[in-house]
Amino acid sequence: MARTTKPEKRKKTIPYNFGDKHKAYIRKSQDCMINVAEGAVRAGKTVDNVLAFCHELKTTKDKIHLASASTLGNAKIILGNCNGFGIEHFFRGQCRWGKYKGNEALIIKGKDTGFKTRIVIFSGAMLASSYKSIRGNSYGMWIGTEINLHHKSFVQEAFNRSIAADKRKIWWDLNPDNPKSWIYTEYIDKYQQDAADCKFLGGYNYAHFTIDDNINISDQRKAEVKSQYDPTSIWYKRDILGLRIAAEGLIFQSFANDPEKYIIPESQLDKSKILSLIHISSPRDVEESRM
């Protein structure tokens, strides 16, 4: 008699560990409308937001919700899958990918939602026209990854689309950008200041993370990753330290680091000899230098 294989039972937990700093951020998000996780790469920011979003999704009365990234594909990979820790894995056995009124969606219904249908619409947000894909819908909660890569019009439209939500909650994550970026001046830093002045209603939750805050990565691997960077480079400051840097595209890094070393006071210049120090290459000079 052929032996039948029993279906694999759903495991109760997903094997992921959260450090104290991450736990504090997730815990605080329960009481805050806007939640922002910023910092270095591989710091665990996205997993925090996905977990918090899914936890709230179980009890929200709103049916339709939004998940966005720079492109639709990125939204499905980063938020839907998230290396095995995404929304589809949180609701494993209780969800399916499909379409909802023409939109890419994860349709959830099971024990975790009280057998009520909850729909997460996935959308790209990078283009100037991306906002059109979410017009006409009303959303409850919104989770956006790499929010600094979203177009401004999409961000504003997403806010407008959630005004009538029963549980209006938003989660963003991002790697550091130029300090003058609109996402800081118009939203993140503005909210931070308003919260400090007790002017922000609904609760604001901000946390900064680095790879050292991710306890799922071994110390040896962290050391290996750091060793691949020049500690003086903007990439180290941005990717490892999680700092906002405006120097991207800088050609003369040595000059920027120590300009005084290369500056000659005007009082020491012999202006009659300045022109002798300047050589302007002609196209012929450039061509001959290549021969």
Predicted regions and their residues:
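ASCE P-loop NTPase helicase motor core
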Residues: 141, 149-229
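Residue-level preference for the first positions of well-ordered beta-strands
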Residues: 34-36, 64-66, 119-120, 141, ...
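Conserved small/polar residues in nucleotide/adenosyl-binding loops
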Residues: 278-285
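Pre-P-loop entry segment of helicase/translocase ATPase cores
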Residues: 1-33
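Inter-Walker segment of RecA-like/P-loop motor cores
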Residues: 81-138
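Conserved P-loop
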Residues: 34-98
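ATPase catalytic-site recognition across NTP-hydrolyzing enzymes
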Residues: 215-276
